[in-house]
Amino acid sequence: MLRRLVLIALALISVFAIACSGGGDIEPADSYDSLAAALESAGMNIDELSENKFLFSGLFSVPGVELTASGQMILACEFATLEEADEQAALVSPDGYGIGLKYINWSNDPQYFQNGKMIVIYDGSRSLVSETLFTAMGERFAGEAPGGA
C-alpha cells in the first residue's frame, strides 16, 4: 500500500513539474507569430503584438512590431526579403547603440538577433528572454548579453 502511494505521488509530482516547466521545444523564429510562439514555449506570457509607432519606429526600413513577453519589451522587424534584412543589419554598430546615422540611448545594453528576414532587438536584462531569443534566433549580431557576457 505504501509503495502504491509513493508511486502515485511521484507520478503526480512528475506531471506537475512537466506542466509547470514551460520548457517546450523552442522552434526557430522567422516571423512575428513564430517569435511569439518561441517566447510562449519558454513559459512567458505574450501580450498582443502591436505595430511599433513609438520612438523607435524609424530605426529600420519597416516599422516592425512591439511585443511584451512577461513584462519585457521586444522590438521585431520582418523584412520583405533576406537581402533587405541583411542590408538593415549591416547598419547596426557592433555595440548596438548606432543604426546608420542614428544613435540610440538604450536603457540597457541592446541585443540584436537576426534569423532570415527577421531582426529582433531586446533592450533588457532578463536572462530567460535573452536565452530564448538566442535559441530561437541564433547568435547576437550586435550588442552584448546582460552583464557584458
Regions found by a protein language model. Give the residues of each.
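Short, solvent-exposed recognition patches
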Residues: 33-105
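Soluble non-cytosolic domains of exported or imported proteins
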Residues: 26-33, 127-131
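C-terminal motif of bacterial Sec signal peptides marking the signal peptidase cleavage site
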Residues: 16-19
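A short, solvent-exposed beta-edge/loop patch
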Residues: 100-149
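Bacterial N-terminal signal peptides that target proteins for export
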Residues: 1-6
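Hydrophobic helical h-region of N-terminal Sec-dependent signal peptides
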Residues: 10-14
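Bacterial signal peptide processing site
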Residues: 21-24
